[in-house]
Each structure stands twice: as structure tokens, then as C-alpha cells.
Amino acid sequence: EEKAAPEPPANPRPEPFIPRNFRFSTDYDLYPGGAKTKYKNNILAIKTLKQIEAEQRTATSEEQITLARYVGWGGLANAFSDKAAGWESEYQELKALLTEEEYKAAMRSTITAYYTEPELIRYMYRALERFGFEGGPDRRILDPGMGTGNFYSVLPEQYQGTKLYGVELDSITGRIAKQLYPEADISVMGYEAVKFEDNSFDVILGNIPFNSVKIYDRRY
């Protein structure tokens, strides 16, 4: 007499969730619409980030798509003005959502926070390939002003496994970057405050903000 197959467990243990770095896809429609759409995407991303942090967990792949739609506040100065016609509700919503420190940082970023298009980033990686950079687990790449990490969203396949590092001054932006790239080593602080050893990176690339502000660096 044949034995019956064993019954599967009533509540099989779910597969453990392993956080992975976000990968850009045109299917996600990350950068649609005008100023109001960008504002709404930013707000949803911030609310998602704060919920994730309150629950002390890592973003799911679906939440990463929401977070990746955060484009910062460049060109959205109206959201920070109580006198901008048509932006009254957005102004109130933003004041209520952000802490005082987050709000001030976001308002300051309206003239500097413009993120780099993925296609432009791909051209920069092609230049790296022509220079002979091969990547690998013993190689290190740094983005010193990474924003939410667009440069790592289109990292070429041959560079997967390369150690990734990033620095971002803005708190909200840097915390989103950490959720999007949990496999990277990201510091949320001013670049002058990060303690990297000299000559410790194989590649430094990015599109950092340009300004005439002088920064104090205790080492120099």
C-alpha cells in the first residue's frame, strides 16, 4: 500500500525578505507631469519614508518605486510660500508634514536640488568603460553628492558587485537614498564631515551641486 504524501505545513514559513538596490526602469514612469505632480510625488515619497522609519524596517520593492519618484524641491519654491496663488493647501500640508529642520533644509534646496537624468548617467558609465574600469568586489565607487542615488539606479551589469558609497547632505533625500540602496554605504551629512581615507576610491562620479559657498574642512 502506497503511503500518502505528507501534508504541507498549515502555515508555511514565508521566504525572508532580502533588501536589494533599486534598479531604474522606464516602466515605472518616475518623472511625469509638471510642478503639482512633482509636488504630489514628493509628498507621497516622504509619507512612505516616515511610515517605513516608524515601523523600523526596510522599503519593499513596491515602496522603492514610490520613493524613487522623489525629485527634490528644485523649481518648486511656490510650495514654500504662503503668498503663492494656487499653492495655499500645498504650503500648509508641507509645513505640517516636515519637522522644522527638514522644512528649512527643503526650502534651501529649491535652488540646488535638480537630479540627473538616467540617460546622461549612462553616457558617463560608457566613458568609464572606455577608460578601462572593470568594477568588481574589490573596487569602490563614490558619489559625493548623490541625491536619492540616480547614478546607482542605472549601474551597468558589469559593475554589479562593486562596493558603492554615497554622501548626501539633505536629511530627507539621504534617508530615501538609504532605502533605495540598502546594499550601499551612505553617509547623510556634509561631505566635509565624512571621514574617508585618502586615495580609497577607484572611481568618484556624480553631478554635485555647484555654488560659491565656502565650506570649512578641518583637514585642509
Where are these regions (language model features)?
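Class I S-adenosyl-L-methionine-dependent methyltransferase catalytic core
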Residues: 1-220
